[in-house]
A protein has these predicted regions:
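Short, conserved acidic/polar surface loops in the N-terminal third of protein domains
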Residues: 52-56, 97-99, 121
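Conserved strand-to-helix beginnings and helix N-cap segments that scaffold or border functional pockets
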Residues: 120-123, 147-151
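Histidine-anchored nucleotide/phosphate-binding helix
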Residues: 30-36, 120-130
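Active-site beta-loop-alpha junctions enriched in small/polar residues
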Residues: 46, 92, 140-142
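Residues at the starts of beta-strands that form the adenosine-phosphate
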Residues: 1-3, 39-40, 106-107, 132-135
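A short glycine-rich beta-strand->turn/loop micro-motif centered on a GG-aromatic cluster
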Residues: 109-113, 133-147, 165
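Active-site acidic carboxylates
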Residues: 1-87, 145, 151-158, 163-164
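Internal catalytic-core helix/loop-beta-alpha segment
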Residues: 69-117
Length: 166
């Protein structure tokens, strides 16, 4: 059994406050991956409160984004019909994510945004929690803050035996 984790495919990371052309470019591929996936699908949502700028993350990245219940926080329209199983997370990685992996899962595939922040954080949490589980990153369905940071994150994950599907 496989599980697909779609990381932070939210409006603010695609066309909003922290959006990019690279993020926009992966949307069709992520839609195709989700539509054709035979297994459990989990979406993560970066979720902040109106006091975001007063948090440690907000002080270091002073751009309001993914404020709960705003348009920017929502999963993009193209993926919204498939986002039935969502987990909200207050930071880059979700410590609750490992508990959502069912017994009998033999592979977890991750895609989404941003490769160098939330994708790598969640992949590393899963790798630490399940060292024998095959964890795969679908690199074509990920985008980083920059293309260079995307590549660096993929290299870092490869170094800890996370599979990278180019």
């Amino acid at each position: 059994m496989k599980t697909l984790i779609v990381v932070d495919m939210q409006n603010d990371f695609i066309t909003g406050a922290l959006g990019s052309k690279d993020a926009e470019a992966i949307v069709p591929g992520v839609v195709e991956l989700v539509k054709g996936f035979d297994g459990k699908i989990i979406f993560t949502r970066d979720t902040h409160t109106p006091n975001y700028l007063a948090t440690q993350e907000g002080r270091k990245l002073p751009v309001e984004h993914c404020i709960k219940d705003t348009h920017g926080w929502q999963i993009c329209d193209e993926l919204k019909p498939y986002a039935k199983n969502c987990i909200d997370k207050i930071t880059f990685g979700s410590v609750d994510l490992p508990s959502m992996i069912d017994d009998g899962t033999d592979e977890v595939i991750l895609c989404g945004l941003c490769t160098d922040i939330c994708v790598i954080s969640n992949a590393m949490i899963l790798k630490a929690h399940y060292p024998e589980l095959k964890i795969t990153i679908d690199a074509a369905c990920c985008a980083g803050v920059t293309r260079e940071s995307h590549k660096i994150a993929l290299d870092a994950m490869r170094a800890v035996q996370i599979e990278i599907k180019e």
